Amino acid sequence: MHKNTYTSVMKIFRFIASLLSITLITSCSSNENSTPSYKSFNEYQVVVDNSIKWPEILNQEEKSYIIFFYSETCAYCHEMQEEVVDFAITCPLKTYFLNVGENAVPIDSDKKIGITNYEEASINGTPSILEVENATITANISGIDDCLTYLNEQRLKQN
């Protein structure tokens, strides 16, 4: 009798272990929450309306404006997508958008400011923001944290 009880307990234990293994395997292979899905930047009308090309970065009509550099493959760009789109819609400082995947944008670790010729300009990667005043780059910000801080500071100045 003792041997039968032990055998029954072991069968139940193996059954439960099998169920747990199956549950673990199926939950790990689920794609539902593994990769967040983001909207394309071009799904926002403000991005479409305010998109510019690399040679145009220093010759916009406004005296002061910013350019947000993004890539559709950049997770950090998508992470701050709602914030930068909201900024572009609600703040008086004009925001332009430049998709580095569609433009040959020079990438350089030297954050150049004081540049007045687009051929000398560069960004440090995506996401990045260039601030332009009187056709001169006055700020060159890169990285999600610094870009979000910059947008918040500008929002406070504008309001």
What are these model-predicted stretches?
Residues 72-76, 102-105, 136-137:
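Solvent-exposed loop/turn segments at secondary-structure junctions
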Residues 93-112:
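Thiol-based oxidoreductase modules, predominantly thioredoxin-like and allied folds used
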Residues 24-27:
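C-terminal motif of bacterial Sec signal peptides marking the signal peptidase cleavage site
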Residues 53-96:
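Local sequence-structure signature of Cys/Sec-based thiol-disulfide redox active-site neighborhoods
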Residues 124-159:
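Non-catalytic, surface beta->alpha helical segment in thiol-disulfide oxidoreductase systems
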Residues 106-126, 130-136:
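Structural alpha/beta surface segment adjacent to cysteine/selenocysteine redox centers
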Residues 29-63, 152-159:
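N-terminal leader/targeting and pre-domain segments
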Residues 4-16:
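Bacterial N-terminal signal peptides that target proteins for export
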